[in-house]
């Protein structure tokens, strides 16, 4: 019964996906097939839709971290857990709730041990804009603590890798929007000095991740409609180009005799 409900819920989500999006352009489609333990470190421009989009596109299940306050009501908590979402709390949601983040991080580490994939929104909040905001420390804490535990425990499983992800929507309100998803290069523990203090490690990691995300996220002023249109312009469809070519070619052959006669007469 539970499996049937989950399948129905997933089918509803896929239907919404088909309604909401016109085209999805991915710079590195092969990234969707990555098999190693993976943390998707992503910007957060469009709330719940960001997580649903990546979960549908990846070949394997993607667990995502969501605002802890939406888990307060039992109904929503059960629904979100079925959608593979885990709560993460910020100071604004109550300092007393921050300790629950340790349970969520432990759950993430178990997912990594099983070779799974987790999505985290590294900006820490959702804002409808074409801009990469400063990164919070949550991603750095989860990543560095996981790497340290893997090294200390001589883990036989593959080491966690971090994949920077930039999601860019042509619109935040219109239905039938285009989406550009840009994947960066994988970040591994070998690029970090894990013997530093926590503060230095978190700062070092965030600088590396911010640099990796910057070219993946479109930078457009809210009222710059010209740049927005140019940035999200799609290449011409090859089939349409071919269909337009046929009448153009036909017109050329029909008008060629008249053109050649006029050219000869003028000369």
Roles of regions detected by a PLM:
Residues 93-100, 201, 234, 238:
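Juxtamembrane loop-helix boundary motifs flanking transmembrane segments in multi-pass membrane proteins
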Residues 2-13, 18-187, 193-194, 249, ...:
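Soluble catalytic domains of membrane acyltransferases
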Residues 240-266:
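Core alpha-helical transmembrane segments of integral membrane proteins
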Residues 1-4, 50, 223-240:
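Compositionally biased, charge-rich terminal segments
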Residues 138, 204, 241, 245:
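Short, well-structured alpha-helical interface segments that form or flank functional binding sites
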Residues 19, 23, 216-223, 253, ...:
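Short secondary-structure junctions and interdomain/linker hinges
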Residues 195-234:
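Long, charge-rich alpha-helical interaction segments
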